[in-house]
Amino acid sequence: MKHLRLLGMESEREALLKAMQDMECVEISSIDVSEEALKSGFAKPDDKALMSAQEASRAYRTALASLDRFAPEKKGMFRKRQGVSRAAFFSAESEENARTAAETINKDTRRLGEIESERTKNEALRATLAPWLTVDVPLGGADGALSVFFGTVGLNVTDDALKALADSLDGLLTWQQASSDRSLRYLLVMCHGSVKERALSALRDLGFSTVSFRGMTGTAKENDKALAENLAALEKERQEIEQRIAGLGGKREALLEASDRAAIALRREEAKSRLVGTDKVFLLEGWLPADHCAALEKALEPFTCAIETREPTEDEYPQVPVQLKNNKLTRPLNMVTEMYSLPAYGTLDPNPLMAPFFILFYGIMMADMGYGLLMMIASVIISKKYRPKGTSGELFSLLGLCGISTFIMGALTGGFFGDFLTQLVAIVSPGTVFALPKLFDPLDDLTMILIGSMALGLVQIITGMAISLIEKCKRKKFLDAFFEEITWWIVFIGIALLALGKGAAVLYVGCALVLLGPIVQGKGWGKLTGVFGSLYNHVTGYFGDILSYTRLMALMLAGSVIAQVFNMLAAMPGNVIAFIIISMLGNAMNFGLNLLGCYVHDLRLQCLEFFNKFYVDGGKPFRPMTLDTEYVDLQ
């Protein structure tokens, strides 16, 4: 990776950034504006253009969400990416059509929100009026000599209590019950104006709570009718708007393209916000892969600019982004590495070393020709038809590679959806014995598979240690390399020789070197007692790591047994059609579980058993300004 610094003309800034974005190889970094720079006139650009780009991107996403709601598209698990030429994609006509459609849809969507708010408010008002529909008295009350109150009391307030209240006011108060529910009585109370205050005080003593109909005139029934008519009008308008939005479903492709265009423009504006400049020039800093320097310089020849590239210093390593550079075989493993953590800049890319182990181990655990065929077919169809990119593309490429390994291991174990063919032939032709040729059987050769699994684990662990040895030698840490890797290899060889009855001399030498290591490395005699504990922990740790690889045998055995059990159950009815249906259902379940289970266990072996021998994580992902699209495929 190279550090890039570029000084260009402000008048060419937009065109230059577009040229860089076409190259898709430059990550633009933020520049801290110092006091000296401010005095020289350098400053960050205003954020108006960035906010405008964010708003445009948000508008298209909102419009698409509305279309998905009111004009849903028939689609399967994956959406096919339409191929679009760059000229058509960036044409002004396409942008104008999409912008008009988005504005119309979003305006109607906002109105739908207003309608929903009004509907909720009106329904709440109708619920408030419902207890008073039998009262033929204006809700606004009365003026002058007559006072009118609408309110509620508890069910414990009896008619006798209300009559006593009226009598205490010399008959100048009367009341009417409008309705009641489980807890309240809804009362209309009328009294002479001269006793209004006394009446209210007495009513409060009974627990009377006033109900206000602010802004309403006329009776409850009249207001309820008006609200019902308004709700009907709102419902009609809502249906018309939804139909209008649904009628714009044909604009979906234009909106999808526009959403991708807006995302590209937004990335460019975000990069622009990291620049500094004056009204005449601008300054850009960032990172680009070393093998793209010449191509970038050629692409920027038409512009008036000065370019400087240099190697990063060691102090800059934590800030240098990391781009994994792999071929078609190892590129799908990027998703595994990125899921764990990118390697620190200046360290080793693990993908080429991990790829053969990951693919082989997955095949060992699945080990079925039928499952392998399904994986390869799914990978080819989805990759060709839907052309997924990014992590999705890597996932289906990895699926195909693991499918090849699964098929090969299935051929070695004679598995095709378990023993599907054996059971099928037995049903079609009773008495006929048929079996696919195989090198070994997961059920009969358990010991061999167990030893083979641990042997493969030992190979991968030693590979990890060898990588660590080479890296330490590159950094001239020869003592660390000898005492932390080579001495342990001597111990392993000694254990193997002892197990074969060849004596313990090599093991004693290895243990002595392990004990000697801290002293030679300058860790002192005081650490000697801790060395014995370290020796024990390392031996048991390595043994535990190797035992972890027995999961290769366990997953192979489990998948094979489950498939055979389903085939056995399917064969019980003795009918070919029933056998095929039941067997395929059972194998589909087994395939789905193993597809995920084998990935998880394979991932664990790489991250915990292999990476911890040499891997240095903490890398920062390389995020260049790109033309990446979500919905269309630029051609």
Which residues does each PLM region occupy?
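Long, charged N-terminal accessory/stalk domains
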Residues: M1-M354, I382, K389-S392, F396
